[in-house]
């Protein structure tokens, strides 16, 4: 089996002008320390690390310049400096060296995404777990609604006003949904609704079937019993509201380094946001806008409206280069971008092949 190609990374913004070698070296050291420990670093420590060496006084002057440029800040008076989100962005776009995927990581991804004897749902859930494990953050895998043609649809009564809809795809996948129906729907209406839809399946996808059935029902509603029509409409409306399946694993890792109540509240808000339908649609839009792996820092993605959170996302494409999902990692701003980007890229390529 051919392996996915090496990572492809597209920077989000051009490298800012006016950053000299000395400033770049100091910013790099500060961001790398932040990624590794989360702690600020001072001029004395930097003076010992930098080659060629600079005096602490010179380093303090450069740090002050970087702070005025909005790239650094001091968490409190006596501390060293930390990078701002703008500083992290500059580092990612112009200073970061992306590592190659190790053979160990490649073998781990290959084995964990082995599809033999497993469902697509299991594989996608496993993909989000492995992303979380390799990134020490939360792994995201979004699979949009399948475009497979339909084989069978069935409606089963569960109780007053509740019906189970069973959707069988030509690829063998089975999807179950519970819908609400008007009271008093008899079993005969459920059978008629199933027969009506099954007689029109042909080689249609769910989207194609939905368009055809709605057009026919608008033109010849009098031919259907009112309760039968309501069952059909409820089923179609349920699938309309579904943008896909989002797998999120490793949320607990986002809480590992949090001590402040304010940050804890932010992460809880993030958890709530991840469960919304809007998040799924936005993830697909972000993936659609990306040729390769894309990094969003803080509010850049437009999804969460909060600082201190970064997201790395890539589209999963099939052999025809059609987007069939989105793969990503979400975590604190001090993610290990150099390691995570090739992991996300390779996983996206593998998942794209599986979903394709």
Curated annotation (Swiss-Prot):
Keywords: Repressor, Stress response, Transcription, Transcription regulation. SUPFAM superfamilies: GAF domain-like, Winged helix' DNA-binding domain. The keyword Transcription regulation applies. Pfam families: HrcA. One of its GO terms (biological process) is negative regulation of DNA-templated transcription. Coiled coil: none annotated. GO terms for molecular function: DNA binding. Negative regulator of class I heat shock genes (grpE-dnaK-dnaJ and groELS operons). Prevents heat-shock induction of these operons. Belongs to the HrcA family. NCBIfam families: hrcA. This is Heat-inducible transcription repressor HrcA. It comes from Gluconobacter oxydans (strain 621H). The gene is hrcA.
